[in-house]
C-alpha cells in the first residue's frame, strides 16, 4: 500500500469526534440558551461561597461528570451538524445543572434564617378577600377533585421532558426561550425565598395531616420541618421544593402553557393541563394566593427578559421548525391527504405564521 493510499484512509474515530467537538463549541454557544447558562453559573458561584462559609458539604461528582458528558455530546453533535439532537443534549445538560445547583442553593438560603413572613402573606390573602381556611376545607370535602389535582400537580416532573421532545421538532426557538425564562424565574424565586421566607398556610393555620386524611401529597407538612432544620443548624442539603414565595410551581405552569402553544394538535391539551396545575398549586402545594400571583408575574417578566436578550445578541438565525425542513414538508404533504389532519395542520401553520410575524 502506498503512502498516498494510506493517508486517504478514514481517521480514527476519536480524531473525528475531537474535530467535531472543537468545531461545534463556538456554534453551540451561539445557538445555546446562553442567558440560562449565565444565570446558572452565577447561582453556582453563590452556592460555592455559601457552602464554604456556612459549612455545607456538597460534592456531586457523578452528576457533574454527567453534565460534562452531555455538554460534550451537544458540542460534538453541533459540529457534525446534527442540530436537533444537539439541542436535546444541551437542554438535558441545563436540567442536570439546575438539579445540581438550585435545591442546594435553596438549602443554603434557608439556613440564613431570615424572619418568617407567613403572617404578612396570609394578611395579603385576607385583604384580597381570600378565606384560605374555608378554601382548604372545601378541597378536603371534595376528595376526588383533590386527588385529580394532586396528579396534575405532579405533572411538572414529566412535562419538561415531553416539551423538550415536542418543541425540538415543532419550535426550537420557543424551547430556548422557555428554558431561559425558567432559569431566570428560578433565580428570582430563590431571591424572593431568601428575603420573604415562609412555611406555608398549612403550617401557619395549624393544620395537621389528620385534618386532611385523603391528602396524597404530604410535602406541605414536611416542608416546614425541612426548613426549620436548616434554620436551626442542619447542614444537610435538601433536594425537595421548599420555596414558598413566589411560587415556582405556578410560574412553571404559566411557562409550560406558553410552551405548549408551539406544539401542533396536542398543544391545547397541554395548555388545559397547566391551567389546572396552576390551580392545584394552592391546595396541593400549600401556597398562599399571593404566591401564585407573584409567581405568574415573575414568569412573564423572565420571558420578556429572555426574548429581549436573544433578540439583541443572536448572530446566527435560530433553528427552524421541523415542519419547514425538506423532510418535514414531505411528511406534511403525506398527511394533507387526510382531511381531518389537513385541517389541523393548516390551522397550526396559520397560527405559527401569525406568531412569527408578531415576533
Name every feature range the model reports, one short phrase each.
Residues 88-96, 161-210:
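Interfacial segments of alpha-helical transmembrane regions
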Residues 195-262, 325:
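Membrane-interfacial catalytic/cofactor-binding modules of polytopic membrane enzymes
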Residues 309-347:
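Membrane-proximal cytoplasmic C-terminal regulatory module of class A 7TM GPCRs
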Amino acid at each position: 500500500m502506498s503512502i498516498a493510499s494510506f493517508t486517504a484512509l478514514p481517521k480514527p474515530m476519536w480524531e473525528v469526534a475531537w474535530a467535531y467537538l472543537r468545531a461545534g463549541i463556538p456554534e453551540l454557544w451561539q445557538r445555546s440558551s446562553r442567558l440560562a447558562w449565565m444565570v446558572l453559573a452565577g447561582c453556582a458561584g453563590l452556592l460555592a461561597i455559601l457552602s464554604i462559609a456556612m459549612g455545607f458539604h456538597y460534592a456531586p461528582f457523578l452528576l457533574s461528570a454527567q453534565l460534562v458528558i452531555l455538554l460534550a455530546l451537544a458540542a460534538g453533535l453541533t459540529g457534525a451538524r446534527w442540530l436537533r439532537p444537539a439541542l436535546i443534549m444541551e437542554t438535558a445538560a441545563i436540567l442536570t445543572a439546575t438539579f445540581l445547583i438550585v435545591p442546594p442553593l435553596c438549602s443554603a438560603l434557608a439556613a440564613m434564617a431570615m424572619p418568617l413572613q407567613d403572617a404578612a402573606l396570609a394578611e395579603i390573602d385576607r385583604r384580597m378577600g381570600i378565606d384560605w381556611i374555608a378554601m382548604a376545607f372545601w378541597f378536603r370535602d371534595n376528595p376526588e377533585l383533590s386527588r385529580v389535582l394532586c396528579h396534575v400537580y405532579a405533572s411538572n416532573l414529566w412535562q419538561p421532558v415531553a416539551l423538550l421532545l415536542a418543541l425540538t421538532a415543532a419550535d426550537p426557538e420557543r424551547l430556548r426561550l422557555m428554558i431561559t425564562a425558567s432559569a431566570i424565574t428560578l433565580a428570582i424565586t430563590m431571591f424572593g425565598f431568601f428575603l420573604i421566607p415562609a412555611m406555608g398556610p398549612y403550617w401557619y393555620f395549624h393544620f395537621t395531616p389528620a385534618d386532611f386524611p385523603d391528602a396524597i401529597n404530604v410535602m406541605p407538612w414536611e416542608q416546614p420541618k425541612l426548613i426549620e432544620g436548616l434554620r436551626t443548624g442542619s447542614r444537610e442539603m435538601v433536594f425537595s421544593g421548599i420555596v414558598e414565595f413566589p411560587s415556582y410551581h405556578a410560574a412553571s405552569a404559566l411557562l409550560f402553557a406558553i410552551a405548549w402553544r408551539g406544539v401542533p394538535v396536542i398543544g391545547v391539551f397541554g395548555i388545559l393541563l397547566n391551567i389546572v396545575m396552576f390551580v392545584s398549586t394552592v391546595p396541593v402545594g400549600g401556597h398562599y394566593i399571593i404566591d401564585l400571583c407573584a409567581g405568574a408575574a415573575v414568569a412573564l417578566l423572565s420571558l420578556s427578559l429572555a426574548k429581549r436578550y436573544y433578540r439583541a445578541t443572536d448572530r446566527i438565525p435560530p433553528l427552524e421548525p421541523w415542519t419547514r425542513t425538506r423532510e418535514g414538508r414531505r411528511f406534511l404533504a403525506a398527511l394533507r391527504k387526510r382531511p381531518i389532519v389537513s385541517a389541523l395542520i393548516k390551522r397550526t401553520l396559520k397560527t405559527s405564521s401569525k406568531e412569527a410575524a408578531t415576533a
